[in-house]
């Protein structure tokens, strides 16, 4: 196999999910976002996972998600590894967020599979690769959360995605612990498997 040289150290450590921050009117709060980011910096965590499930991304507009990420990056001042979840329920918006995230200098982008309709695996791979192509210089993390997305990352789909050199690993929030072992074994040391559920912290 080819030897992949990449620095995965920046992904090793505690990377909490970033919570949605709103003002009293229910709008995204840039001040709140910056305050929470600074809190994480002070606590000494390795990084943050922005605009994921805890960030309520599926209820937010593209514009809101950009504002959140911009304010995280501003307050983090390079002290945190930032993984930005960019998936929307259409490729175009996802690509726009991916491109935006890369322009801000995030460490990685992440995406869940398309939700609602259960698409065949080749369509999921195309969706992910199209998003990744919009941020060609940025690491890509697959987000496996079958209980919410309705589709699971299979070994075949993972193998297909590893052909994309930007794919560095999986954020796994499926419940069976065996899944993590399985992905680890399949991918080897050049990939990182992030563990989603707190109760499986390793």
Question: How would you describe each model-predicted region?
Answer:
Residues 134, 146-202:
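Catalytic alpha/beta core domains of metabolic enzymes, predominantly
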Residues 6-16, 21-152:
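Active-site beta->alpha loop and helix N-cap motifs at the rims of alpha/beta catalytic domains
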């Amino acid at each position: 196999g080819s030897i992949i040289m990449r620095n995965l150290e920046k992904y090793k450590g505690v990377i909490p999910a970033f919570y949605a921050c709103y003002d009293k009117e229910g709008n995204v709060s840039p001040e709140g976002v910056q305050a929470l980011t600074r809190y994480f910096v002070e606590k000494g965590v390795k990084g943050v996972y922005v605009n994921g499930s805890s960030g309520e991304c599926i209820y937010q507009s593209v514009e809101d998600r950009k504002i959140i990420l911009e304010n995280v990056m501003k307050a983090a001042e390079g002290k945190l590894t930032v993984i930005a979840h960019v998936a929307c329920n259409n490729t175009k918006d996802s690509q726009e967020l991916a491109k935006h995230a890369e322009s801000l200098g995030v460490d990685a982008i992440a995406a869940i599979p398309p939700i609602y309709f259960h698409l065949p695996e080749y369509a999921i791979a195309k969706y992910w690769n199209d998003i990744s192509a919009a941020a060609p210089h940025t690491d890509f993390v697959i987000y496996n959360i079958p209980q919410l997305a309705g589709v699971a990352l299979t070994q075949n789909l993972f193998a297909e995605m590893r052909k994309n050199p930007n794919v560095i690993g999986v954020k796994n929030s499926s419940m069976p612990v065996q899944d993590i072992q399985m992905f680890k074994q399949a991918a080897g040391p050049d990939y990182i498997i992030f563990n989603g559920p707190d109760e499986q912290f390793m």
